[in-house]
Amino acid sequence: VKFDPQPAAARAAGIFVGVLCGAAAAFGWAAGFVAAKHGISIGFSPADLAFDRFFWTGLLLMPVAFRDGISNPGGIGWWRGLVMSVLAGPPQAMIAYSGFILVPLGHGTTIQPACATLFGLILATVVLRERATAMRVLGGATIIAGLIVFGAESLATIGHSGVGGDLLFVTAGLFWASFGTLLRYFRLSGTRATTVVAVLSVLVYTP
């Protein structure tokens, strides 16, 4: 029987692209955190930063979102779009940015992505019915251990306000994980969903 290497090659290429996209997203996320912390330190409020983050993008993408008509923005509908806008739009952003008022930059850049991953693992098992492999369980346990260390450090060095800041990042991570889970559950295009989030953020949040 002749062995066809194409499936293995295709899987390897897919893994490579996935890792590359993940690394690029992590870099972009980290850069965004640094910019947000700097903005907070020079006097911008979380609401100001959320406005600046979504307003210009929303204006630019508005023709794309409504090219199929105003009744079906981005092809995903109003109610799905509004839910996505809560989970990945200004509410999520303001929760995350508020955390930087209370705790150092390192807490946000670690806790929010870690919680997004942890809650993503949980939601994938509960909502998407994906199998909880031993590696996933081990990874989740490692994340929990790290979060406990961060929480203890906040309580010891910053006090209750530090724990409050950490919990804001935990909440922001939960929102982001829920957004990703719903993308999979509804089989939505990430590009379409992001476009609708930006546009509805302009229409609902900006006024």
Regions found by a protein language model. Give the residues of each.
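Glycine-/small-residue-enriched transmembrane alpha-helix faces in small-molecule transporters
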Residues: 2-48, 145, 155-185, 203-204
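Specific transmembrane alpha-helical segments of multi-pass solute transporters/efflux pumps
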Residues: 28-33, 65-112, 121, 149
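Hydrophobic transmembrane alpha-helices of multi-pass small-molecule transport proteins
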Residues: 61, 135-154, 198, 202-205
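Loop-to-transmembrane alpha-helix entry segments
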Residues: 110-113, 129-149, 159-166
